[in-house]
Amino acid sequence: LVLLDIKHINDEEHIKLTGRTNKNILDLAKYLSEIKKPVWIRHVLVPKRNDYDNYLIELDKFIKELDNVYRVEVLPYHTLGVYKWQELGIENHLEEEGIKPPSKERIDNANELLHTKSYTRYLK
């Protein structure tokens, strides 16, 4: 089983969010599908970054192309670890920009658009 985090489906926006391309992540997802390795897709939902409907619909389309996805989880962005960043002297652009955790409505919307309830396969 592989837990695969897809933070953003759009490469340009992924780079803005993480500083890195998503190409390797998406290629790995396709490869894992080819070899039938079970995967749980996890998507950290960040307001004003990757919670827009068009991105969620695009991510859903990508996930549907894979035939090895056992679960899709929406993980709401939170600020519980902000103090760790501060202690390490690492800039947190999301905090600086006032990004807050998503509302229940946005979380529910993401779960609906990503059809998270449709993924109920279990490992044997």
Question: What are these language model-derived features?
Answer:
Residues 1-80, 84-87:
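Conserved AdoMet/S-adenosylmethionine-binding subsite of the radical SAM
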Residues 32, 114-115:
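A generic structural signal for well-ordered alpha-helical segments
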Residues 37, 90, 119-120:
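Short aromatic/hydrophobic-glycine micro-motifs
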Residues 48, 103, 116-117:
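Serine/threonine-rich low-complexity intrinsically disordered regions
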Residues 54, 61-64, 70, 85-113:
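A structural motif corresponding to the C-terminal lobe/cap of the Radical SAM core domain
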Residues 116-124:
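Radical SAM enzyme core and accessory elements
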